[in-house]
C-alpha cells in the first residue's frame, strides 16, 4: 500500500473537496485538488480540456498527475472528480493508497441540487436541454457511478 496517497472521490454532486479538506486538516497533510493541479499545469479549464482533447485526453492528464503524486516523498490528500476511477491506470494508483468515497450518505435529490450549483462541470449534459432532460441524464450517470463506487467499497472491504 502507498501510504503517501489518500484519494477522495464521489458521485457527481458529492462534497468531495469538503471531505478532502476535512481529512487533510485532521491528518495534518497537504491537500491537492487534482483538477486545479491539471488546470495550473495545462493553463486551460477542465471543461476546455475535455472539449479540446476529449475525456480520454483528460483522463491521461489525471493519470500523469496521480502518478507523480504517488511517487512523491511527501504524503498528501488528493481531491478527485467523479470519473477518476474510470481509468484503469489511475484506479491502480488509487488502490495502492487509501480511497475515500464522499457523499455516500446523500440522496440522489441532494446530489442533484449540488450538481446544479456546480458552474465548472465538464459534464456536457448539464449545459443543454430541458431541466427534465438534464435530470434524466444525471440520474443515469448517478446509477452507473453508484454501482462503480459500491464495487470499490466492497473491494476495499476485502483488503
Each language-model region and where it sits:
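NTP-dependent small-molecule kinase module
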Residues: 2, 22, 26, 75, ...
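Structural motif
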Residues: 7, 77-79, 101
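Glycine-rich phosphate-binding P-loop
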Residues: 8-21
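Short amphipathic alpha-helical segments
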Residues: 20-21, 89-92, 112-115
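Post-Walker A helix-loop "phosphate-sensing" segment adjacent to the P-loop in P-loop NTPases
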Residues: 25-34
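Conserved beta-strand scaffold positions in the cores of enzyme catalytic domains, especially
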Residues: 31, 96-101, 151-153
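ATP-dependent small-molecule kinase phosphotransfer cores
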Residues: 36-93, 126
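A glycine- and Lys/Arg-enriched "phosphate-lid" helix/loop adjacent to the NTP-binding pocket
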Residues: 96-144
Amino acid at each position: 500500500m502507498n501510504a503517501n496517497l489518500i484519494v477522495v472521490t464521489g458521485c457527481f454532486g458529492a462534497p468531495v473537496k469538503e471531505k478532502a479538506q476535512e481529512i487533510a486538516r485532521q491528518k495534518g497533510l497537504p491537500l491537492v485538488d487534482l483538477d486545479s493541479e491539471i488546470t495550473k499545469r495545462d493553463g486551460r479549464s477542465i471543461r476546455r480540456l475535455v472539449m479540446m482533447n476529449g475525456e480520454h485526453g483528460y483522463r491521461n492528464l489525471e493519470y500523469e498527475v496521480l502518478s507523480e503524486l504517488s511517487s512523491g516523498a511527501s504524503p498528501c490528500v488528493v481531491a478527485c472528480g467523479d470519473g477518476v476511477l474510470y481509468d484503469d491506470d489511475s484506479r491502480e494508483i488509487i488502490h495502492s493508497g487509501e480511497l475515500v468515497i464522499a457523499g455516500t450518505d446523500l440522496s440522489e435529490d441532494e446530489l442533484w441540487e449540488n450538481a446544479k450549483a456546480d458552474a465548472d462541470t465538464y459534464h456536457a449534459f448539464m449545459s443543454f436541454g430541458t431541466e427534465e432532460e438534464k435530470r434524466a441524464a444525471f440520474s443515469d450517470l448517478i446509477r452507473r457511478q453508484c454501482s462503480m463506487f459500491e464495487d470499490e467499497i466492497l473491494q476495499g472491504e476485502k483488503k
